[in-house]
């Protein structure tokens, strides 16, 4: 039972770290995109409203 629990904890931890890394990269990429093309994003917002 302890072995199964240990494997599950390690697996969960790996998954959580992967998701944190992906989320971090995603937010960095999004903020960089907004800095590069501010006018483009503003135009999109105007068209929606």
UniProtKB/Swiss-Prot annotation:
Q: What is its main location?
A: membrane
Q: What is this protein called?
A: SPbeta prophage-derived uncharacterized protein YoqT
Starting at the broadest rank, the lineage of the source organism is: Bacteria, Bacillati, Bacillota, Bacilli, Bacillales
| Keywords in alphabetical order | Cell membrane, Membrane, Transmembrane, Transmembrane helix
Report one GO cellular component: plasma membrane
Gene label: yoqT
How does the entry describe its membrane topology?
Single-pass membrane protein
Q: Which residues cross the membrane?
A: 7-29
Domain of life, per UniProt, equals Bacteria
Q: Where in the cell is it found?
A: Cell membrane
Query: Could you tell me which species this protein originates from?
Result: Bacillus subtilis (strain 168)
């Amino acid at each position: 039972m302890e072995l199964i629990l240990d494997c599950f904890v390690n697996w969960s931890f790996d998954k959580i770290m992967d998701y944190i890394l992906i989320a971090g990269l995603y937010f960095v990429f999004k903020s960089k995109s907004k800095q590069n093309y501010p006018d483009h994003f503003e135009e999109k917002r105007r068209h929606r409203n």
